[in-house]
Design a protein with these regions (language model features):
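Short loop->beta transition adjacent to catalytic acidic/histidine clusters or analogous donor-positioning motifs
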Residues: 3-7, 29-38, 62
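Conserved donor-nucleotide/metal-binding helix-loop-beta segment in metal-dependent transferases, i.e.
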Residues: 104-143
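A conserved hydrophobic helix/loop-capping motif in glycosyltransferases and polysaccharide synthases
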Residues: 7-16
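C-terminal catalytic/acceptor-binding lobe
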Residues: 2-4, 21-22, 168-296
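Active-site-proximal specificity loops/subdomain of glycosyltransferases
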Residues: 39-96, 100-106
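Short alpha-helix within the catalytic core of nucleotide-sugar-dependent glycosyltransferases
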Residues: 23, 89, 100-113, 161, ...
Length: 296
């Protein structure tokens, strides 16, 4: 419990390679986290065994939740997990299995409690291009991606009126013909190695790697939901029901537009996201994940 709220962490899993780093981080916060839900989506039997063994270590605290179609890399599976995330007096935090560092999770919870007017609240996330862009970290933005934010915002502003007419199963950026990913920041693992290395070498400078105060996201921008918190009461209030749509743009574009309720970044809290799938092959050839594992 924290601030009178039950705290539930949910992780779509999973890959043992990543979970070997994430599970000890979550385990270290067991004293105030009320429940850890493992959203089981393993495709490798050994990964599944690893998750089940972890759950066995923590009876009554870890809950295994199975998807509708075990076990595929399928959006239908992802979105089915959200069905039971709307209890009153509960703060939910979705933490992807490739989050490899968390600082001040309590701050993320406190900011979510303090800002009931915000639907979703994010920490600053390393390797989440909108965080680097909105933080104004030009030195981290490759020349190929310098104009990405301006193009996205201009195109979205011009096309957003169409959102309410789009079918619920349609990927919004594709439907609106938006350039969804910055080419280098999302797709080039060489850039990601440099980014993680820089963070690992300078992470003690927390002002560099977090927002100094709560920051409202007042544009329709598709922040990657590698880690995000919400109030169950808000989901009930706004009747949030995700059934067929890709979750990322549903949470960050469609709902803010339809409801007029914007998201935000918590102050002084940080997470590191290991990789988007195009980055993984190159990252796995380095010692980056091993360096994160040694931080605990």
């Amino acid at each position: 419990m924290r601030g009178g709220y039950r705290i539930v962490i949910c992780s779509p899993v999973g890959r043992k390679q990543n979970l070997a780093v994430l599970f000890p981080i979550i385990e270290s916060m067991k004293g105030w986290i009320d429940e850890y839900r493992i959203w089981m989506n393993c495709r490798d039997p050994m990964d599944m065994v690893y998750c089940l063994e972890f759950a066995k270590k923590h009876p009554g605290w870890v809950t295994i939740v199975h998807g509708e179609k075990p076990y595929t890399f399928d959006m239908i599976n992802f979105i089915s997990f959200y069905a039971n995330c709307h209890d009153e007096n509960t703060i939910y935090i979705k933490i992807d299995d490739d989050i490899c560092y968390i600082r001040n999770l309590e701050g993320l919870v406190d900011e979510t409690i303090a800002h009931p007017e915000r639907l979703f609240v994010f920490p600053y996330i390393v390797n989440n291009f909108w965080c680097q862009i909105l933080k104004g970290q030009d030195f981290l933005i490759p020349d190929t991606d310098k104009d990405f934010a301006a193009r996205w915002k201009a195109d979205m502003d011009k096309e957003k009126y169409k959102i309410k007419t789009l079918p619920r199963d349609m990927f919004i950026p594709k439907a609106l013909k938006l350039d969804f990913f910055p080419r280098t920041m999302w797709g080039d693992g060489r850039y990601t190695v440099i980014l993680h290395d820089h963070f690992l070498n300078t992470k003690e400078d927390t002002s560099k790697w977090s927002f100094p105060e709560f920051t409202t996201i007042d544009d329709l921008i598709a922040v990657s939901i590698n880690m995000v918190a919400w109030r169950g009461s808000n989901w009930k209030k706004y009747n949030v029901q995700i059934t067929t749509e890709e979750d990322e743009t549903y949470f960050t574009v469609r709902l803010p537009y339809e409801l007029g309720v914007f998201n935000g970044f918590a102050a002084n809290t940080t997470a590191a996201h290991y990789s988007f799938y195009p980055q993984k092959e190159i990252l796995d050839q380095t010692d980056i994940l091993d360096r994160y594992s040694k931080l605990r």
